[in-house]
């Protein structure tokens, strides 16, 4: 772990760190400094191993929550940093907050939000690149809200061919949903594999997906540049799933069906 000066981490440096398997944290909400973390053991959630319980499947199908992507990134990170019962402090400092907002503006940090009656009641945010998504934090103000956000995340990542969902540290909550712990050395191998160059077929598929959902993202197939088929990443997968569920009374039906096939 090494200390750096107290100002927002440049997006290029932050993304480079994630590509190398390390990430920043702060000691407290008011800490002006950050330290770089490379855990000896790493939690990941295998995308084909998400545990979809019957109760969560019912919640998805009922459509209790309205789910969005990148609609309220700052509100999500603020909710994740807010004091909670039994956890008054947070590693999400002002510096961490500004750093991830900057990365979001550069297209590599994303959020998923759960709304109920117009109120933000759950969500998560993280960092996306290549075939990788690194989950940073989640919050829930109503039962199952964060689980629904995670279910949409997993289904969306699978839709765009992602291979690695990094959870950083394991918790009982994440373990109940399928997260497992592996040595950092094994994680780095998976990380390297997930960043391999894209094949012409993968680039073509990404362009086709961009054309299909481009209106919702403000882009088209031409926006998929050489070398980064995942430039669209989570938002494209999310938009595609929303489009598939457009004719349903509950878009969550699509998510439940998708995850039931492998859960």
Swiss-Prot record:
Localization annotation: Cytoplasm
Catalyzed reaction equations: N-terminal L-lysyl-[protein] + L-leucyl-tRNA(Leu) = N-terminal L-leucyl-L-lysyl-[protein] + tRNA(Leu) + H(+); N-terminal L-arginyl-[protein] + L-leucyl-tRNA(Leu) = N-terminal L-leucyl-L-arginyl-[protein] + tRNA(Leu) + H(+); L-phenylalanyl-tRNA(Phe) + an N-terminal L-alpha-aminoacyl-[protein] = an N-terminal L-phenylalanyl-L-alpha-aminoacyl-[protein] + tRNA(Phe)
Keyword Repeat included in the entry's annotation: no
Gene3D superfamilies: Leucyl/phenylalanyl-tRNA-protein transferase, C-terminal domain (3.40.630.70), Leucyl/phenylalanyl-tRNA-protein transferase, N-terminal domain (3.30.70.3550)
Pfam family, one: Leu_Phe_trans
Leader sequence residues: none
Coiled coil: none
Keywords recorded for this protein, A-Z: Acyltransferase, Cytoplasm, Transferase
GO CC annotation terms, alphabetical: cytoplasm
Molecular function, one GO term: leucyl-tRNA--protein transferase activity
Major subcellular site: cytoplasm
Listed GO biological process terms: protein catabolic process
EC number(s) per entry: 2.3.2.6
Tagged with keyword Transferase: yes
Protein family according to the UniProt entry: Belongs to the L/F-transferase family.
Job of this protein: Functions in the N-end rule pathway of protein degradation where it conjugates Leu, Phe and, less efficiently, Met from aminoacyl-tRNAs to the N-termini of proteins containing an N-terminal arginine or lysine.
NCBIfam families per UniProt: aat
PANTHER family: LEUCYL/PHENYLALANYL-TRNA--PROTEIN TRANSFERASE, LEUCYL_PHENYLALANYL-TRNA--PROTEIN TRANSFERASE
Name the UniProt record assigns to this protein: Leucyl/phenylalanyl-tRNA--protein transferase
Naturally occurring in which organism (per UniProt): Novosphingobium aromaticivorans (strain ATCC 700278 / DSM 12444 / CCUG 56034 / CIP 105152 / NBRC 16084 / F199)
Originating gene: aat
């Amino acid at each position: 772990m090494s200390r750096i000066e107290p100002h927002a981490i440049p997006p290029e440096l932050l993304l480079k760190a994630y590509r190398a398997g390390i990430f920043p944290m702060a000691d407290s909400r008011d800490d002006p400094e950050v330290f770089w973390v490379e855990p000896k053991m790493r939690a990941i959630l295998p995308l084909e191993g998400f545990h979809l319980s019957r109760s969560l499947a019912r919640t998805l199908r009922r459509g209790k929550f309205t789910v969005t992507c990148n609609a309220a990134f700052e509100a999500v990170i603020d909710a994740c940093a807010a004091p909670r019962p039994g956890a008054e402090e947070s590693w999400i400092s002002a510096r961490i907050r500004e750093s991830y907002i900057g990365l979001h503006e550069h297209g590599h940090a994303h959020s998923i939000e759960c709304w109920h009656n117009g109120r933000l009641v759950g969500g998560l945010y993280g960092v996306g690149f290549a075939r990788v998504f690194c989950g940073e934090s989640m919050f829930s103000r109503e039962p199952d809200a964060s689980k629904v956000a995670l279910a949409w995340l997993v289904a969306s990542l699978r839709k765009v061919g992602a291979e690695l969902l990094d959870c950083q540290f394991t918790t009982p909550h994440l373990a109940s949903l399928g997260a497992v712990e592996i040595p950092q050395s094994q994680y780095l191998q998976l990380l390297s594999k997930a960043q391999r160059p894209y094949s012409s077929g993968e680039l073509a598929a990404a362009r086709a997906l961009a054309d299909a959902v481009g209106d919702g993202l403000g882009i088209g197939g031409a926006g998929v540049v050489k070398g980064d088929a995942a430039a669209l990443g989570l938002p494209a997968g999310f938009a595609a799933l929303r489009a598939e569920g457009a004719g349903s009374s509950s878009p969550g039906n699509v998510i439940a069906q998708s995850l039931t096939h492998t859960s």
